[in-house]
Swiss-Prot record:
Function statement: Represses a number of genes involved in the response to DNA damage (SOS response), including recA and lexA. In the presence of single-stranded DNA, RecA interacts with LexA causing an autocatalytic cleavage which disrupts the DNA-binding part of LexA, leading to derepression of the SOS regulon and eventually DNA repair.
Family statement: Belongs to the peptidase S24 family.
Name of a matching Pfam family: LexA_DNA_bind
Reactions that this protein is recorded to catalyse: Hydrolysis of Ala-|-Gly bond in repressor LexA
Complex and partners: Homodimer.
Annotated HAMAP family: LexA
Species of provenance: Mesorhizobium japonicum (strain LMG 29417 / CECT 9101 / MAFF 303099) (Mesorhizobium loti (strain MAFF 303099))
Alphabetic keyword roster: Autocatalytic cleavage, DNA damage, DNA repair, DNA replication, DNA-binding, Hydrolase, Repressor, SOS response, Transcription, Transcription regulation
DNA-binding region: 26-46
One of the record's GO molecular function terms: serine-type endopeptidase activity
Keyword hit for Thylakoid: no
GO biological process, one term: proteolysis
Active site: S166 (for autocatalytic cleavage activity), K204 (for autocatalytic cleavage activity)
Lineage of origin: Bacteria, Pseudomonadati, Pseudomonadota, Alphaproteobacteria, Hyphomicrobiales
Protein name: LexA repressor
Length: 245
């Protein structure tokens, strides 16, 4: 039997993972449950872990997995677990420096006998994205992957393999595959693919500092980088994440 706060936290974590594949931060959990401090979140997570509802993934900051839900809503969790995480092996496009990412439209695969394949959406893998020091701009599609349709909510999408550890406190790790919705604008606080000086691509949290744009890491080892507005172009916004365990 869960307490009301335990149940609220479990469902908040579950819904966030279902929407984006990324667990909420302790600050987000504290605000969602209207608690005064993060110590209360630590106690609730420990209680949920002891009861077998969640588990903390070892050696990974802020990495949580929902193992089960209360019996009355467990079928929804089972349905969400049909999709198995995988690692995408991307590569940098050659000769494409300084050009913007141009993903192909996401599309449904042809109907077949495999129910999972029919319900999946195929999106292009465009290579690697830096979650650290920016790397050369990504240009060419390497291959495609299939993702659950509820991860794609309209618009054009593409996938990138994460390289680096600057976003670990946002639950994004080296080797993860991020699902990006093509966009050229972002709201403050959103995680974006940013093209810097027409030649370097990086995955960072988007902020505004007066007339300037700040690309903020989610790792205290990395400094926030500030640029003039004409030096940064938003290439897309994070909508999901795929991970191999």
């Amino acid at each position: 039997m869960l307490t009301r706060k335990q149940h609220e936290l479990l469902m908040f974590i579950h819904e966030r993972l279902k929407e984006s594949g990324i667990p909420p931060s302790f600050d987000e959990m504290k605000e969602a449950l209207d608690l005064a401090s993060k110590s209360g979140i630590h106690r609730l997570i420990t209680a949920l872990e002891e009861r077998g509802f969640i588990r903390r993934l070892p050696n990974r900051a802020r990495a949580l997995e929902v193992l089960r839900l209360p019996d009355s809503i467990a079928p929804g969790l089972n349905a969400a677990k049909k999709f198995s995480p995988s690692v995408i092996q991307g590569s940098l496009g050659q000769g494409g420096l300084g050009r913007q990412i141009k993903p192909a439209p996401s599309r449904l695969p042809a109907a077949g006998n495999d129910d999972d394949a029919v319900s999946a959406v195929s999106i292009p893998v465009m290579g690697r994205i830096a979650a650290g020091v920016p790397i050369d701009a990504i240009q060419h599609q390497t291959h495609s992957i299939s993702v659950p349709p509820d991860m794609i909510m309209g618009g054009e999408h593409y996938a990138l393999e994460v390289k680096g550890d600057s976003m670990i406190d946002a639950g994004i790790f080296d080797g993860d595959t991020v699902i990006i919705r093509n966009a050229d604008t972002a709201s403050p606080g959103e995680i974006v693919v940013a093209l810097v000086d027409e030649e370097e691509a990086t995955l960072k949290r988007f902020r505004r500092k007066g007339a300037s744009i700040a690309l903020e890491a989610a790792n205290p080892a990395y400094e926030t980088r500030i640029f003039g507005p004409d030096r940064v172009k938003v290439q897309g916004k994070l909508v999901g994440l795929i991970r191999r365990y």
